[in-house]
Amino acid sequence: MASTLPTTWPHESVKFEDVSLRFTEEEWALLDRQQKCLYREIMMENLNNMISVEHHFSKANVMPQLEEVEDCWPMQREIPQDTLPECSGHSLDPEMNSFPAESPLMKIKVVEVLTLNKDMAGPRNALIQSLYPESGEDLNPGNLKPAQQPSKHLTDTEASRQKFRHFQYEESAGPQKSVSQLRKLCHQWLQPSTRSKKQILELLVLEQFLNALPEKLRVWVESQHPEDCKAVVALLENMTSVSKDDAWLACSSEATDELKEKRKDVATLPVTVPPEAPVTFQDVAVDFSQEEWQLLGPMQRTKYHDVMLETLGNLVSVGWEPTLGNRELTPDSPIPVVKPIHDPNPKDLSRNRTQSTLFESISPDEVQGRHTIESNPVGLLQEKGHPQQKLSESSKSQNQTCIDKSQCSLNEVLPRNHVKVKQKGTGKGKGRTNTISMTGGLRIRNQQKDSVEWRDRSGSTPVTHGSSIKNQQLGSEQGKTQTSRDPITLTVPAEFYQEATGSEEGRFRNSSNAMAADAPPKIHQKGPEWHKAGKSNNSMLQGSSAQNHQMGSRAGRARDNSILTHVKIHQKGYKEGKIQGNNNYLKHVKPHRKGSKEERLRELSTCQKHVPYVKQHLKTSGRGKGRKINASIKCGPYIKTYYRGSDVGRLRRANNCRKAISRHAQQISFIKIHKGSQVCQCSECGKMFRNARYFSVHKKIHTGERPYMCMSCGKAFVQSSSLTQHLRIHSGERPFECSECGRTFSDRSAASQHLRTHTGAKPYQCQHCGKAFRQSSHLTRHVRIHTGERPYVCTKCGKAFTQSSNLIGHQKTHRKKFKKQPKL
């Protein structure tokens, strides 16, 4: 505290009692430790002022005043006795201990005792430290520096501010005590007794300004301990060359080595001029080894594919000539295609949205031992005009891949359509190019010689296997081409194609059997298992539905009429011994010609030649609606007939046949409860349904019909939704995520059941006792306790159980008994 000495002095001597402040015992007990320390500092400042004006007073007059704050000096008893030899001993004589004016050093020693020693004084007693001599000079009143204001205790001030800002009201303390505590904390923070209003205002502005700074910047500024707003402004102005990462490292004592290395690399990165040589795709491409590629998951591979396509689009957009001629794909290099995580639904994609480009995954293990693609296998060029002509020209130049430059941009990525497989010919020197769709088509039919069409799911691009590719829209006539979107082809050796698809040379030839909707080319791995009908065109695999089989072009629908021809044999019957249908089926019809009408019908049921899922085919083709159709359809061990005007379908057993004779799919036997009502009842089990649509699914339980089959494991399902859910097991897709904990599920119902564990909802309540459950299966199991139902019966001892798990455990006891029996 700097001040000028007065020129005139009062005649009366100033005593220490005149400038000291005393507390009673009750008042002193109410003060906390910080307030007592503040009192000590003020007393020390008054003492220093008295010494600076050459006031003479004895130690006995000073010590009683400062003994009250003895608890603030825990180290006073450890001060060496030689610090003040004149004051050794407990009994101090006032006359012996008076401080003469000619001995300023004695005054300093007294001050030293009061401030716990020079080394212990620290920044809290900067005022006392200023009284010590510099360079060993003796002190005199002229050499003493004016008193300075004690330094601000930033640590204590910050702690007080934090306590004041985070003060919480306690009901047990009461409002009056809480207000007094808050006022005390505010005084400790702002210190109105020692600070002016301007300084207090500066503290408030400083606090608000620090809170307004970004988090990392605020932490760094607080680590510098600025005293006022000017210091903060100076720090921020000097930060023009300091990044936020540097600021974070400056305030963090545990910075990671990785971040330090990154900072070093960024700092030492030389500023170079971009090269004048053209940028190639290899400069921006990222390659993975076989081991690295196997460690990537499906999502990471999809991300890698998207990033590479985006990089390619950037290069094409700036006029780069996209060629990969000098890059050879070897068995050691990963195939830059990724496995599709899900098949994109075209209905969910708008015109302006980017369509997902998901490729069939080819692991590096499948590439082992296969031939290397030629040195210049893949090229990119812009196709204009006639696609067929351009494609034929491109096939002469190493089968280049065609991309429409207008379609290739950062906002839209071309979808995968098919893989072109080049196979070297052996006859006249001409090779054959096999093209396979990678999107999952709807069907394959014989379009021309050595050509099989696999239509894209979106209907935009059909894919042809053979010597030519023709773009046909779904439902359009044959020959009508489409140029809105050009295909993407990838050249692959024929040996790799044959091993990947499991098909031999000519497997696609003369094949008009329809394929499943979601089946990739791997459907041919099953071999003859999927062609049980041999060369017959009467069998059709059920993919999404037989309706997709009828959505093709008119020419394909006209050609593939063998199924209808077979149905006509049974549908129209025999008219006076004349056979209605194709002459190729004379041998098939002759066994049914003899006998009466009932006998012919009975023999007709023994027909072993069948057409799976004919009723779905007829439903989509529009034929047979509203009339009776007795077709040999594989429906189970029963024969169902339905006559117009009858209320209940007649059910009778076929003794020698596993086939059934039934009406159209929409006219299967059921009982309507009320006329005009949608509520119906199954004629076999009596189960009620709110709508005939639900009954159409239920009836497959009795008939054993499972039209939706998994192409990976061969498991069949009644509903398409069940197949979709099952396919997620093979693909690993888990699209349903819990919003509470982030856990993912492959089934929507499983996600909803899991969510009930967070919400505590129990929607399934027992009508007998009122107990609620989270899952319907738990309720079904509980109801058996009330009803006494025991559906699970042991076949060996006849004991019944309410749960299947109990039955399984019981059956193990029989096995143990059988093992314990001694051998004879």
Swiss-Prot record:
The keyword Ribosomal protein does not apply. A zinc finger (C2H2-type) spans 680-702, 708-730, 736-758, 764-786, 792-814. The lineage of its organism: Eukaryota, Metazoa, Chordata, Craniata, Vertebrata. Residues 340-351, 447-458 have a biased composition (Basic and acidic residues). Transcription regulator which may participate in NGFR/p75(NTR)-mediated apoptosis. Probably acts as a transcription repressor: specifically binds to the 3'-end of zinc-finger coding genes and recruiting chromatin-modifying proteins such as SETDB1 and TRIM28/KAP1, leading to transcription repression. This is Neurotrophin receptor-interacting factor 2. The gene is Nrif2. One of its GO terms (biological process) is apoptotic process. GO terms for molecular function: neurotrophin p75 receptor binding; sequence-specific DNA binding; zinc ion binding. It comes from Mus musculus. Residues 14-85, 279-359 form the KRAB domain.
